[in-house]
């Protein structure tokens, strides 16, 4: 705790805004990575998309940010704008994107996800910039390297955790839904040649769709939980070189 030059300065966690930013950063990265993994997994398993086809959809998330990123920076640099509410709007947009995606059916393809991708393109800069402002607003210049260490650690952990959690939950929920669907078939088709195998494939396919919907709703719940955290934890900060009204 009293080490003169620690790699992780635990005392910085006593700053509410920094602690909030680290928690929310981890949550936001979980949401972002999860949305990519769920969507790409669905398109690969149900529509047979290859990686380059999924990458085309990801461009709908990345390229619009070349426009939205500077706009959000200008907005957050306005003293009258409370960046906490910019962050709240961002999380609500992410939750909306997840709820829309949870309505997916086996007929959905990459084109169907474009509106959802555009919502992400707007929401992501609206989350990252306010989080950086909240984290750095009350720090001294000498605290910068220690804060960077915390941010990098959270980023690495969140990305790894999201990938592992989505893979595990997708398999568990997929098996559960596939088993439930298969039980509903009964034995009426068991006498037909090849029917059992066909029904198993159909159950697995529909089970993956339902599992993807479950995961989208779970991620939406995380976004709403982080939105509620904004109401109780962070304090307002102002842009650099601005005077509070």
Give short role names for the model-derived ranges.
Residues 2, 68-70, 197-200:
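Short amphipathic alpha-helical surface micro-motifs
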Residues 2-7, 242-244:
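Flexible cytoplasmic inter-helical loops of multi-pass small-molecule transporters
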Residues 5-175:
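12-transmembrane solute porter fold
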Residues 132, 138, 150-245:
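Hydrophobic transmembrane architecture of multi-pass small-molecule transporters
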